[in-house]
């Protein structure tokens, strides 16, 4: 097993937890497994209807470091207002809406997450190659939410989860008033830590984001358990914000010169 590292940052992100259309299109407070697996499948050119093609991603383990949770933003959104009925939004029955469709869409503004993707070596290599030259471009939950660069921080590391604790620069302001060599940072893990270890005390939460099918007419997800922890991260990773981009680029390029 090995892995890669992704940095999910941008002006807006939106990680839907429900596949059904509802008046309020909510976002989860962190990247969902469904969205990330969908990103990998799209990068590899796997069609939405290819349910069998998703099986290999069952081997993937995802760990999310919450560098900055962002601010919840809600967009008031209308479709089809001010037009004759034949030009308004279509219905499932083949007709058209009588008036504008009103929805509210939630986003995370200015959020930053770093994701450790752990998988068998061959799958890690396939994912890294696809994310460097994707068949369909990656986005942060919705197509309008493009990721900032650097996006793919490392294509191959032996222990990507350890890099979240000791290697990847942290998007956090300098903490001049906090003593000690570490900073408390929130993580989301797919398996619990060893009892007694740093951050082992976890909140277990139930989420419905295990993708079964992305078929446009038969989307399906299963529930799973996620472990939310607060863990000590090396304070050295939270350097001056004015040098953050340089430090991120240096970290990403260090792999090429190793």
Question: Which role fits each region the language model picked out?
Answer:
Residues 1, 61, 110-114:
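Short, surface-exposed beta-edge/turn micro-motifs
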Residues 1-2, 214:
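Peripheral peptide segments
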Residues 66-258:
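Internal, well-folded beta-alpha domain core
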Residues 3-8:
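Short amphipathic
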Residues 2, 17-87:
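Glycine/small-residue-rich interface belts in oligomeric ring/scaffold proteins
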């Amino acid at each position: 097993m090995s892995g890669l590292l992704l940095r999910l940052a941008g002006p807006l992100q939106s990680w839907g937890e429900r596949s059904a259309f509802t008046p309020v299109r909510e976002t989860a407070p962190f990247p969902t497994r469904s969205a990330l697996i969908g990103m990998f499948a799209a990068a590899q050119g796997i069609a939405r209807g290819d349910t069998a093609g998703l099986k290999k991603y069952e081997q993937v383990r995802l760990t999310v470091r919450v560098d900055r949770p962002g601010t919840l933003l809600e967009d008031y959104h209308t479709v089809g207002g001010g037009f004759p009925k034949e030009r308004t939004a279509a219905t499932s029955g083949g007709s058209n809406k009588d008036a504008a469709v009103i929805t509210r869409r939630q986003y995370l503004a200015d959020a930053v997450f770093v994701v450790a993707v752990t998988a068998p070596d061959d799958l890690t290599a396939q994912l890294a190659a696809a994310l460097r030259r994707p068949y369909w471009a990656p986005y942060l939950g919705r197509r309008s939410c493009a990721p900032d660069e650097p996006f793919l921080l490392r294509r191959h590391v032996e222990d990507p989860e350890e890099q979240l604790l000791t290697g990847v620069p942290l998007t956090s302001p300098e903490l001049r008033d906090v003593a000690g060599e570490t900073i408390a940072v929130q993580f989301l893990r797919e398996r619990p830590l060893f009892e007694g270890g740093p951050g082992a005390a976890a909140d277990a939460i139930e989420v419905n984001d295990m993708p079964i099918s992305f078929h446009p007419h038969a989307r399906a997800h299963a529930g799973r358990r996620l472990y939310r922890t607060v863990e000590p991260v090396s304070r050295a990773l939270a350097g001056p914000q004015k040098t953050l981009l340089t430090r991120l680029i240096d970290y990403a390029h260090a792999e090429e010169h190793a």
